[in-house]
């Protein structure tokens, strides 16, 4: 742990902050971020770039890539030598993280005419030369003119700090960007505060029930995330239906969200007043989820940030599923204490491609969670912390014994989130009677209306799946009589409508 902590303290020295001098807010945000992360003033880099999100390859070369290469050499962040073939090679690398600030261009449009030094290949991948600015910058140190296709990522599936990777001069590029400057400032503050106080809350994972056409891998990622969270004592609500979470679904205390597959932000996120837990990580798989970051309702990346997420990932153009961020790897590395930037790049198979990561590159939401002072952290974190501690201490128990002990412990302490999670684990395994019992306990322990309604919805689902629709109907009606009307209660009305016997015509 000592070496890990020393490495963490050295992260600012490995980081540069790049802003657009043509955008006044960009420099102010760069200085704000550098101040929060103790990044030296001489690690701030201003470039005079176009104002548009989408730029040409020529504009990228002239205003971003070539000026940055010169600055890297001038400031001795790179030591470059000329190889036998006459090409430049980066010999040593002092900078590993790059934070692009709001105002920097987002993506490079396709080149229709021949580009000197490029050799396009055949097929849907090697023939394409558009890319995100961020992913292109990650291979800046390769000094290559090859822009078609992808560069295989040597860090993919890695499990060590990027400073230990010597296979290639890799830059881990993320951006602090959002529809508004105030949102970017909030993302910066939330990340720093979550590291101090802990990222506590539940995960919501939205599968798509895809079983063919190569898309089943996305659902495999989602199922793996559920298992990863359970091992760490992070409660999970998992929806494996083809549709996304319903509009009014009570998504309270959302610290992690992973889902797919809708074009624009939808579901509970569009409910008035929805907010993530400060510091939340959220990602939704879609081909154009980050086609723009300037519209709080277009795609997913910008809208998720606008609704309170501190970090997200997305794509600026069609990437193909296997070449998007593998969300199961992303989540696993975050849970193991890596930075957001390291986690994203370890989850990405391809570079010089379509992906972007939006958030503080140095953000480590789970690095300190075993060292956070329980007396200093908010009282509201006690239940989440207790579940995490239980999961770690009892990780050697088999599933049945683990859930039995978890339910006993949670029942004694009235840990509602833990009881609900045990119930959902039992339901996934088809153990409906014990699932219903645990969910009923959780419902009794919760005090907030939306949490109670969510448990009722889950109980009704368990009754229906166990062949007892009348029990589900009775429960929905009983709760509707005593719970005040809310958007979430509309889902109970739907259960009532669906299950009420229709009179014969």
Regions found by a protein language model. Give the residues of each.
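Structural motif corresponding to the intra-repeat A-B loop/turn of tetratricopeptide repeats
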Residues: 396-397, 429, 466, 499, ...
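Structured catalytic cores of large enzymes
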Residues: 53-223, 227-230, 352-366, 370
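C-terminal soluble interaction/assembly domains
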Residues: 274-347
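Caspase-like cysteine protease fold
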Residues: 336-401
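Structural register within alpha-helical repeat arrays
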Residues: 389-390, 422, 459, 496
């Amino acid at each position: 742990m000592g070496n890990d902590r020393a490495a963490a303290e050295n992260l600012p020295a490995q980081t540069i902050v790049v802003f657009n001098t043509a955008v006044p807010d960009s420099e102010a945000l760069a200085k704000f971020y550098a101040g929060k992360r103790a990044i030296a003033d001489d690690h701030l880099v201003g470039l005079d770039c176009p104002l548009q999100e989408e730029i040409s390859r020529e504009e990228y070369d002239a205003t971003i890539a070539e000026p940055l290469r010169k600055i890297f050499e001038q400031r001795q962040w790179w030591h470059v030598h000329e190889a036998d073939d006459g090409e430049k090679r980066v010999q040593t690398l002092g900078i590993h993280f790059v934070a692009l600030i709001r105002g920097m261009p987002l993506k490079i449009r396709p080149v229709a005419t021949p580009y000197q030094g490029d050799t396009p290949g055949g097929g849907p991948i090697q023939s394409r030369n558009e890319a995100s600015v961020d992913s292109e910058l990650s291979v800046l140190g390769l000094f290559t003119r090859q822009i078609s296709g992808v560069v295989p990522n040597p860090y993919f599936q890695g499990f060590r700090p990027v400073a230990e990777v010597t296979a290639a001069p890799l830059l881990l590029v993320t951006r602090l960007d959002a529809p508004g400057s105030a949102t970017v400032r909030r993302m910066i503050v939330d990340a720093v505060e979550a590291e101090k106080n802990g990222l506590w809350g539940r995960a919501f994972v939205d599968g798509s029930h895809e079983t063919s056409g190569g898309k089943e891998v996305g659902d495999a990622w989602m199922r793996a995330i559920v298992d990863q969270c359970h091992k760490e004592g992070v409660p999970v609500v998992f929806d494996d239906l083809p549709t996304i979470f319903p509009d009014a679904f009570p998504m309270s205390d959302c610290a992690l969200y992973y889902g797919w597959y809708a074009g624009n932000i939808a579901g509970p996120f569009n409910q008035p007043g929805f907010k993530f837990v400060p510091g939340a990580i959220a990602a939704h798989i879609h081909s154009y989820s980050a086609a723009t970051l300037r519209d709080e309702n277009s795609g997913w990346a910008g809208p998720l940030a606008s609704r309170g997420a501190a970090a997200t990932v997305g794509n600026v153009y069609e990437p193909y599923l296997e070449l998007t961020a593998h969300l199961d790897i992303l989540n696993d590395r975050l849970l193991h204490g890596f930075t957001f930037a390291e986690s994203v790049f370890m989850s990405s198979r391809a570079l010089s491609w379509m992906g972007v990561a939006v958030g503080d590159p140095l953000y480590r939401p789970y690095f300190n969670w075993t060292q956070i002072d329980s007396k200093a952290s908010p009282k509201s974190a006690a239940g989440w912390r207790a579940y995490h501690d239980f999961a770690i201490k009892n990780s050697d128990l088999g599933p049945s014994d683990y859930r039995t002990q978890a339910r006993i412990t949670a029942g004694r302490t009235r840990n509602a989130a833990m009881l609900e999670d045990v119930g959902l684990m039992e339901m996934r395994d088809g153990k409906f009677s014990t699932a219903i019992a645990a969910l009923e306990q959780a419902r009794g322990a919760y005090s907030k209306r939306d949490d109670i309604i969510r448990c009722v919805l889950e109980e009704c689902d368990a009754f229906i799946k166990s062949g007892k629709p009348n029990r589900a109907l009775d429960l929905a009606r009983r709760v509707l009589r005593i719970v005040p009307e809310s958007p979430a209660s509309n889902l109970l009305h739907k259960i009532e409508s669906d299950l009420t016997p229709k009179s014969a015509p």
